[in-house]
Amino acid sequence: MKFNLIKKLTSVALIAAIILTGCAQGTQGTQGENQDKKTFKIGISQLIEHPALDASKKGFVDEMKNMGLDVEFLDQSAQGELANAQLIAEKFVKDDVDLIFTIATLSAQAAKQAIKGTDIPMVFTAVTDPVFSQIVSDLNVTDNNITGVIDAAPIKENLEMFKELDAGIKTVGIIYNVGESNSEVQVERTKAAAAEIGLAVETVGITSVNDIPQAVDTISKKADGLYIITDNMVASAISLVAKLAKENKLPTVSADGTHVAEGILMSEGISFYEIGRESAMIAKQILVDKTDIAKIPVQSSKSLEKIVNLKTVEELGFNKDNQAFKGAEFAE
């Protein structure tokens, strides 16, 4: 497929860039007036570019600057490939960065392996269950020089919105990447939460974004609505998912608020920008305050945002006054 060819070429180019440039494409933080003030070198390893993960990175960088730290950011994307994430993490270790900030589960798993035997701390975000994904062994007392902020969304509350939207919704569908442990966790949690409120769940696993059209078509024949978990493969093609769902008259609810701008009907979830900011605060504790990382528990964001796409409301024939939209911010 053309997409896969482009992906492979992009991955080759990325590997070459890492080797030849030594991750030199960083951005400089705000410089303090005191010339003796330490400049920290932070490696940012992002699994793939899409609005949610981009927002986490922006939140992290913005907050580091807001706190007045001098930081050189070494910013790399793995283009969705674990092999690239491993290369990036290994290069950061070779460059002796002061801290590695990872965005998404696979990037965190790769960095965990790379920092073994070093004193380089790692802060992760955009991970749903770091214990299940074997990034940390405990959420309260972290180990291996690793801590971070999880992106777990209020699954039960999101599912209840389907029932508020239309009492006729009895089954919701989920499309997910079978190779992402983050997604496996969410699928199981969604099934459990759905059972509590009397909803059935149909799932379709994918291995490529090229599988999405068929997956949506399959879901449309088995389910009354589509629930979007925080799956990076699905998120990278979220505008396509939204378009296909609307064509099939499937109401969509997402765990990620950034998806609403791409045409998803609604979301009540965490702010990826905020978990990026919260990760920066942890990084400051480690780098500046010299807090023992083992005493910094894995954190979860308390900041939720409820957003509704007004155009999608109209296209699907819902009333703006629907109970499900109560208290929401409407976006065009």
Model-derived regions: residue spans:
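Beta-alpha junction/loop-to-helix N-cap segments that form part of ligand/metal-binding clefts
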Residues: 77-137, 231-246, 250
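Hinge/cleft segment of the Venus flytrap/periplasmic-binding protein
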Residues: 285-332
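Extracytoplasmic "Venus flytrap"
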Residues: 39-61, 67, 74-84, 179-183, ...
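Hydrophobic alpha-helical segments within soluble ligand-binding/sensing domains
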Residues: 129-171, 270-291
